[in-house]
């Protein structure tokens, strides 16, 4: 079934969501590689193929190795590949993305706050929230990945 092209049906809505995306990617002190890492993990949790494709490519362009990128879904078992800041961001991204289950626990907040100052933690949470919103639009309207078949 074909679904609406939400960019053309609601250009104002797309622009508003794009504005939040622009802020979190250019208006914070968070390193670009960290932002794309969070974008990728959130997209994996939400099952957004379009966003997984984009942010995998962005991480590779930002200098993260293929070996590390392929282990993002199991980062807990490959924690040694990630910095303290990356591990804290990944853990907080999972906590916030699964907020219905986790309720953004005090323990998880304290762990993130031990690594990020207050402003960066707020900006990180905005980054997570932005990608969750974008993923929900991508999945709901079936945005396709850019990847081409190997055959």
Where are these regions (language model features)?
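Hydrophobic alpha-helical segments
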Residues: 1-151
């Amino acid at each position: 079934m074909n679904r609406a092209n939400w960019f053309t049906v609601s250009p104002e809505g797309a622009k508003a969501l794009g504005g939040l995306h622009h802020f979190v990617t250019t208006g914070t002190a968070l390193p670009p590689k960290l932002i794309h890492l969070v974008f990728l993990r959130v997209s994996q949790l939400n099952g957004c193929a379009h966003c997984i494709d984009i942010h995998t490519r962005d991480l590779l362009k930002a200098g993260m190795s293929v070996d590390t990128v392929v282990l993002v879904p199991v980062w807990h078992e490959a924690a040694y590949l990630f910095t303290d800041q990356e591990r804290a961001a990944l853990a907080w991204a999972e906590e916030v993305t699964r907020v219905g289950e986790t309720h953004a626990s005090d323990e998880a907040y304290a762990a993130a706050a031990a690594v990020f100052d207050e402003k960066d933690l707020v900006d990180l949470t905005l980054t997570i929230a932005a990608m969750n919103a974008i993923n929900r639009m991508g999945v709901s309207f079936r945005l396709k990945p850019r990847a081409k078949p190997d055959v």
